[in-house]
Swiss-Prot record:
GO terms for cellular component: extracellular space. Belongs to the GnRH family. This is Progonadoliberin-2. Stimulates the secretion of gonadotropins. It comes from Clarias gariepinus. The keyword Cytoplasm does not apply. InterPro entries: GnRH (IPR002012), Gonadoliberin (IPR019792). GO terms for molecular function: gonadotropin hormone-releasing hormone activity; gonadotropin-releasing hormone receptor binding. Residues 1-24 form the signal peptide. The keyword Secreted applies. Its main location: secreted. The gene is gnrh2. It comes from the Eukaryota. Keywords: Amidation, Cleavage on pair of basic residues, Hormone, Pyrrolidone carboxylic acid, Secreted, Signal. It is found in: Secreted.
Amino acid sequence: MVSVCRLLLVAALLLCLQAQLSFSQHWSHGWYPGGKREIDSYSSPEISGEIKLCEAGECSYLRPLRTNILKSILIDTLARKFQKRK
Protein backbone atom coordinates (compact mmCIF):
# COMPACT_ATOMS: atom_id res chain seq x y z
CA MET A 1 0.00 0.00 0.00
CA VAL A 2 2.85 2.36 0.83
CA SER A 3 4.57 1.72 -2.51
CA VAL A 4 1.31 2.41 -4.39
CA CYS A 5 0.94 5.77 -2.59
CA ARG A 6 4.55 6.67 -3.38
CA LEU A 7 4.06 5.67 -6.99
CA LEU A 8 0.95 7.84 -7.27
CA LEU A 9 2.78 10.76 -5.61
CA VAL A 10 5.71 10.45 -8.02
CA ALA A 11 3.32 10.19 -10.99
CA ALA A 12 1.43 13.30 -9.85
CA LEU A 13 4.68 15.24 -9.40
CA LEU A 14 5.89 14.21 -12.85
CA LEU A 15 2.56 15.20 -14.38
CA CYS A 16 2.74 18.65 -12.74
CA LEU A 17 6.35 19.09 -13.84
CA GLN A 18 5.52 18.08 -17.41
CA ALA A 19 2.58 20.49 -17.53
CA GLN A 20 4.78 23.32 -16.27
CA LEU A 21 7.50 22.63 -18.83
CA SER A 22 5.10 22.28 -21.74
CA PHE A 23 3.75 25.81 -21.28
CA SER A 24 7.19 27.42 -21.19
CA GLN A 25 8.25 29.43 -24.22
CA HIS A 26 11.61 29.40 -25.91
CA TRP A 27 12.79 32.89 -26.73
CA SER A 28 14.93 33.22 -29.81
CA HIS A 29 16.90 36.26 -30.86
CA GLY A 30 14.60 38.89 -32.34
CA TRP A 31 11.36 37.21 -31.23
CA TYR A 32 8.91 38.49 -28.66
CA PRO A 33 6.13 36.70 -26.76
CA GLY A 34 3.32 35.44 -28.94
CA GLY A 35 5.64 34.69 -31.87
CA LYS A 36 6.00 38.33 -32.86
CA ARG A 37 9.24 39.33 -34.50
CA GLU A 38 10.81 42.76 -34.46
CA ILE A 39 10.33 44.07 -37.99
CA ASP A 40 13.38 46.33 -38.06
CA SER A 41 15.79 43.53 -37.12
CA TYR A 42 14.99 41.49 -40.27
CA SER A 43 16.70 43.40 -42.99
CA SER A 44 18.36 41.09 -45.46
CA PRO A 45 19.65 41.97 -48.91
CA GLU A 46 18.13 38.69 -50.18
CA ILE A 47 14.51 39.84 -49.79
CA SER A 48 12.49 38.66 -52.75
CA GLY A 49 10.29 40.86 -54.89
CA GLU A 50 7.15 39.21 -53.49
CA ILE A 51 8.02 40.28 -49.96
CA LYS A 52 8.71 43.82 -51.18
CA LEU A 53 5.24 43.85 -52.73
CA CYS A 54 3.77 42.72 -49.42
CA GLU A 55 5.31 45.68 -47.67
CA ALA A 56 3.31 47.91 -50.00
CA GLY A 57 0.13 46.13 -48.93
CA GLU A 58 -0.37 44.14 -52.12
CA CYS A 59 0.11 40.60 -50.85
CA SER A 60 -3.08 38.93 -51.95
CA TYR A 61 -1.33 35.56 -52.28
CA LEU A 62 -0.94 35.44 -48.48
CA ARG A 63 -4.63 36.10 -47.79
CA PRO A 64 -7.16 34.05 -49.70
CA LEU A 65 -10.11 36.04 -50.95
CA ARG A 66 -13.19 35.80 -48.76
CA THR A 67 -15.39 34.84 -51.69
CA ASN A 68 -13.18 31.82 -52.39
CA ILE A 69 -13.40 30.72 -48.76
CA LEU A 70 -17.18 31.04 -48.70
CA LYS A 71 -17.43 29.26 -52.01
CA SER A 72 -15.30 26.34 -50.82
CA ILE A 73 -17.31 26.07 -47.58
CA LEU A 74 -20.57 25.96 -49.52
CA ILE A 75 -19.22 23.36 -51.93
CA ASP A 76 -17.95 21.19 -49.06
CA THR A 77 -21.29 21.46 -47.25
CA LEU A 78 -23.23 20.52 -50.37
CA ALA A 79 -20.88 17.60 -51.05
CA ARG A 80 -21.38 16.27 -47.51
CA LYS A 81 -25.16 16.54 -47.82
CA PHE A 82 -25.02 14.76 -51.16
CA GLN A 83 -22.89 11.95 -49.69
CA LYS A 84 -25.33 11.53 -46.77
CA ARG A 85 -28.22 11.07 -49.22
CA LYS A 86 -26.45 8.17 -50.98
